[in-house]
Amino acid sequence: MSKLQDSLNSIKYDINKPLKKVLLVAVSKTHPESAILAAIDAGQFDFGENYVQELSRKAENLANHPICWHFIGTIQSNKTSQIAKYASWVHTLTKEQHAKRLNDQRPTNLSPLNVLIEVNISGEESKGGLTNYKDINTLATIINSLPNLSLKGLMGMASNTMDEIVIKNQFNLLSSYLEQLNNDGFNLTELSMGMSNDYKLAIECGSTMVRIGSKIFGERSYGD
């Protein structure tokens, strides 16, 4: 068994508990296509990319493989057409303008683009995301009016800290926002939270999707 396969099996053992379905998104940014193919051989089909150019290249080169691509990077207006073309999921939506561009640019032969609203749960200015419930609700309402987008839930990143109480409080905040949205008439199921260092805590707090890179692929690579 390869190291990569062993890592995937270990993580899936952690996240696949009875009565709890959690999707593993393998963050493959900066890693070569050969690493993605090795992960596919090990049974992994959901992959996350941060950079549009890299997503486009990999999606084209690996088009014959059953991959579900998740865009997890910062959205730029001049690159939304490529995201709309290649991604099945977008985890980082924060602006009405981007939502409308993704909706208008989604190819007609594809199903609606699954989207998550990014929420800043850490309070850190270096992290993206909306910071109050009113703005989250407003954007969610707009997304629901766009036929080529399908709002599924929320995404957030916790602080980079060893303090588990701080991390749990931040994850619980995201979970509470999802509950508020559903109380307001939305029907959302997904919480994308948890990375290599905190995914177990995230699952305890209700995460349905975890984004893990280095724990699977090792440290970042910068070339194929």
Where are these regions (language model features)?
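Conserved alpha/beta-domain cores
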Residues: 1-197, 203-205
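Expand to "…catalyze enediolate/carbanion chemistry for C-C bond making/breaking, isomerization
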Residues: 183, 201-204, 211, 216-223
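Paired acidic/hydrophobic, glycine-rich loop segments that form the ligand-binding mouth/hinge
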Residues: 48, 210-211
